[in-house]
């Protein structure tokens, strides 16, 4: 598939915005220094001005006024800590055309093909050189359109990023701002002096793979990875949830806990982990509803903490299907205000937050990361030409990282997008649907 860029514009806020440096909290900084990729797809409506660049750029320029940090650049303070320099430098808006059709992307698995729908960012010139938000509208020959989004992770997490994108789409439809962004991250400042009360296993190094005769690598080469997406219907999710009552269990586990636990179990089985192998699950956990007092609606930034149950693979595989969900459930129950405030303090005492940033070394076999977008309004970006037929990650950077996505049609189904070693993917699919 060929994609030809027609025009690239740096879109700036439509009015004067505060010129300031925005302080970042510890949870803004303990994230990978890259642009989180996501892609929306839209079917044609027959409208003559379908995804008109002028309409989109005008609305974008308007949305950047209240969300002015999005138009800024990263910089460092005198201690080397990353801040956002808010001077209205602008966001990159690219318009492109493709000789392909939307259906060429099949089930929209976040493969390398999807990655070309998002502008590539050149990180080689330093952190002040690139836009925090890069956008690409690609028109396909079927009349459909994709919107590719790359959002610098220090600028926003999923909830804040979608608050911005959905405000932009509302403004393109002529609507006004409903919830203003709250631009002050000092609400997540550590206590002075910091008083961590817990050991914070989530920031400790993960278990390493025990070498057995079965998994001894033949060469030093990094194993080939594969990315797939699997859909589970509402009936399948309900069947899975009903399994929480097996073997006399009386605790009520949510559909999410059962699904995430089942993904963890299926991954352990597909990887053929040794019976005594420890495995750590990393669950991205939004602190907005857990902190007390709760953050103002529209708090703009990162409020993602990490829940990390650890279990032995043999237990996950041999115990009832709800066992993995019980490990998640218990770990999530601990994520209250005291724990999250302690995490902010724990991070404050670390000499180098970069050392704690999660990456390939974190999620790889025998461990797993799960990020759920199920409760996020990922399908609300209606720019005046209807809701997207799909929205999901535009790539999965690491083996062992997965996403749970809600249905675009609200039919109760969920999809699991995951990156695993290629030799484990077929087995994962088998175990995922076997319950």
Curated annotation (Swiss-Prot):
Which reactions is this enzyme annotated as catalysing?
A: shikimate + 4-coumaroyl-CoA = trans-4-coumaroylshikimate + CoA
Q: Where is the active site?
A: 153 (proton acceptor), 382 (proton acceptor)
Q: InterPro entries, from UniProt?
A: CAT-like_dom_sf, Plant_Fungal_Acyltransferase
Q: Tissue expression, per UniProt? A: Highly expressed in stem vascular tissues.
Q: Mind listing the UniProt keywords for this protein, alphabetically?
A: Acyltransferase, Transferase
Q: What is its EC number?
A: 2.3.1.133
- Fetch the Pfam families from UniProt: Transferase
Q: Which residues cross the membrane?
A: none
Extract one GO molecular function annotation from the record: acyltransferase activity, transferring groups other than amino-acyl groups
> According to its UniProt record, which protein family does this protein belong to?
Belongs to the plant acyltransferase family.
Protein name as catalogued: Shikimate O-hydroxycinnamoyltransferase
- Gene that this sequence comes from: HST
């Amino acid at each position: 598939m060929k994609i030809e860029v027609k025009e690239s514009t740096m879109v700036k806020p439509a009015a004067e915005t505060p010129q300031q440096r925005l302080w970042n909290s510890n949870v803004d900084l303990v994230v990978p220094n890259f642009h989180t990729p996501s892609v929306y797809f839209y079917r044609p409506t027959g409208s003559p001005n379908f995804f008109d660049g002028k309409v989109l750029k005008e609305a974008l320029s308007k949305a950047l006024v209240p969300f002015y940090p999005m138009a800024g650049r990263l910089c460092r303070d005198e201690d080397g800590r990353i801040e956002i320099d808010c001077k209205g430098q602008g966001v990159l808006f690219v318009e492109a055309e493709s000789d392909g059709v939307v259906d060429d992307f099949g089930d929209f698995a976040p493969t390398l093909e999807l990655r070309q729908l998002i502008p590539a960012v050149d990180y080689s010139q330093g952190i002040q050189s690139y836009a925090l938000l890069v956008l690409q509208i690609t028109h396909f020959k079927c009349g459909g359109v994709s919107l590719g989004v790359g959002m610098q992770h220090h600028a926003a997490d999923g909830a804040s990023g979608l608050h911005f994108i959905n405000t932009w789409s509302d403004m393109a439809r002529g609507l006004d701002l409903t919830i203003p962004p709250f631009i002050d991250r000092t609400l997540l400042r550590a206590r002075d002096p910091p008083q961590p009360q817990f050991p914070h296993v989530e920031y400790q190094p993960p278990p390493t793979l025990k070498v057995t005769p079965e998994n001894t690598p033949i060469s030093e080469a990094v194993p080939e990875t594969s990315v797939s997406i699997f859909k589970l219907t509402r009936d399948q999710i309900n069947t899975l949830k009903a399994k929480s009552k097996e073997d006399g269990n009386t605790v009520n586990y949510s559909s999410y806990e059962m699904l995430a636990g089942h993904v963890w179990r299926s991954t352990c089985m597909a990887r053929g982990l040794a019976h005594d192998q420890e495995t750590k699950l990393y669950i991205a956990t939004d602190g907005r509803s857990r902190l007390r007092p709760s953050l103002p609606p529209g708090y703009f930034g990162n409020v993602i903490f990490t829940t990390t149950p650890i279990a032995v693979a043999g237990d996950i595989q041999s115990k009832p299907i709800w066992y993995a969900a019980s490990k998640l459930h218990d770990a999530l129950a601990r994520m209250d205000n005291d724990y999250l405030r302690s995490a902010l303090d724990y991070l404050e005492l670390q000499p180098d937050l970069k050392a704690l940033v999660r990456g390939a070394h974190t999620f790889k076999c025998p461990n797993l990361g799960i990020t759920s977008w199920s409760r996020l309004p990922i399908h609300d970006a209606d720019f005046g030409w209807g809701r997207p037929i799909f929205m999901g990650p535009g790539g999965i950077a690491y083996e062992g990282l997965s996403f749970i996505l809600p249905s675009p049609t609200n039919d109760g189904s969920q999809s699991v997008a995951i990156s695993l070693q290629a030799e484990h993917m077929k087995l994962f699919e088998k175990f995922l649907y076997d319950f």
